[in-house]
């Protein structure tokens, strides 16, 4: 659906690979990572750098449950296993922390979200006491099930011994003829496990990327989140919806960024820096009281204090 020769997980948001976003947010919460890949995955392995990664091959694609089953030899009995998805790049660290915390208490926690339009997603089925009973996929859902707006994100955390046990009990008796990872929820309920649910506050945080439209939406959401964080730290943005940082930006006091400015790579701004509209700044350091005039392109440069930079100079 990406209509690209590039692997989906190597498309970028904020100039960072989708999979790298997931690795970066997870690495501070886990001791090791098992990443499931298919054949012809050398480009993915070469692009992603993290010492905690163990690459696991899934020879045949027989569903999400089958994918996770490939990691069984590497799952430790007393560990908490966190299951994430390579095409969900906006997940926040605090959400992972909460999910793991709940799993340590009950043995199993699940991340859900409420959508106005839940079409295509697995629905969370609860009993009369509000406890999670099962997850029903769109193609297997009844008319009553389809009215439910709380959906499964697929993101979960559970005890390693439980995960191994339930993965080995998965069946393929569904419309797709696949091993659904979500079926372990119903198996756990029958095993008298009380599944802790955590409803994600923002649907944006758990959006998956399946096409170029969703990729562009994720890019804008990511940039707006960065803009909000920068403004909270004192940066003045004339219009945060027309601001892009595709890398790392540090800044001093009283800096102002006008519209349509793009930062790429690693950039450092001193105090009282003014960047005018339509500038591109890449891997540069700009000194105190500098003024960057409209339409300037600065690449791998050091700009001195109290300097005025104009284009075509």
Put a short name on every predicted segment.
Residues 1-5:
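N-terminal nucleotide-binding beta1-loop-alpha1 segment
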Residues 6, 37, 85, 112-113:
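Short beta-strand/turn micro-motifs composed of small residues
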Residues 12, 16-94, 98:
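Conserved N-terminal catalytic core of the sugar/cofactor nucleotidyltransferase
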């Amino acid at each position: 659906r990406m209509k690209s020769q590039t692997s989906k997980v190597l498309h970028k948001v904020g100039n960072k690979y989708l999979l790298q976003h997931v690795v970066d947010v997870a690495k501070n919460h886990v001791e090791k990572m098992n990443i499931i890949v298919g054949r012809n995955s050398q480009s993915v392995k070469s692009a992603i750098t993290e010492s905690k990664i163990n690459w696991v091959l899934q020879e045949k694609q027989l569903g999400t449950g089958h994918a996770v089953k490939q990691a069984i030899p590497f799952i430790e009995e007393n560990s908490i296993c966190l299951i994430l998805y390579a095409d969900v790049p906006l997940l926040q660290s605090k959400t992972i922390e909460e999910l793991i915390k709940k799993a340590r208490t009950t043995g199993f926690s699940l991340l859900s979200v409420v959508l106005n339009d839940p079409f295509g997603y697995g629905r969370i089925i609860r009993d009369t006491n509000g406890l999670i009973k099962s997850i029903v996929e769109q193609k297997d859902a009844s008319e009553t099930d389809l009215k439910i707006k709380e959906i499964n994100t697929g993101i979960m955390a559970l005890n390693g011994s439980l995960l191994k046990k339930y993965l080995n009990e998965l069946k393929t008796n569904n419309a797709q003829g696949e091993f659904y990872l979500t079926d372990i929820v119903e198996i756990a309920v029958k095993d008298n496990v009380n599944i802790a649910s955590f409803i994600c506050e923002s649907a944006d945080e758990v959006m998956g990327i399946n096409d170029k439209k969703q990729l562009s939406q994720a890019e804008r959401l990511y940039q707006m989140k960065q803009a909000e964080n920068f403004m909270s730290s004192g940066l003045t943005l004339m219009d945060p919806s027309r601001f892009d940082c595709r890398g790392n930006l540090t800044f001093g006091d009283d800096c102002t960024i006008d519209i349509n400015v793009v930062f790429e790579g690693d950039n450092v701004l001193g105090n009282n820096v003014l960047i005018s509209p339509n500038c591109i700044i890449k891997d540069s350091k700009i000194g105190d009281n500098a003024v960057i005039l409209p339409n300037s392109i600065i690449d791998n440069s050091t700009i001195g204090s109290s300097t005025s930079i104009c284009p075509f100079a």
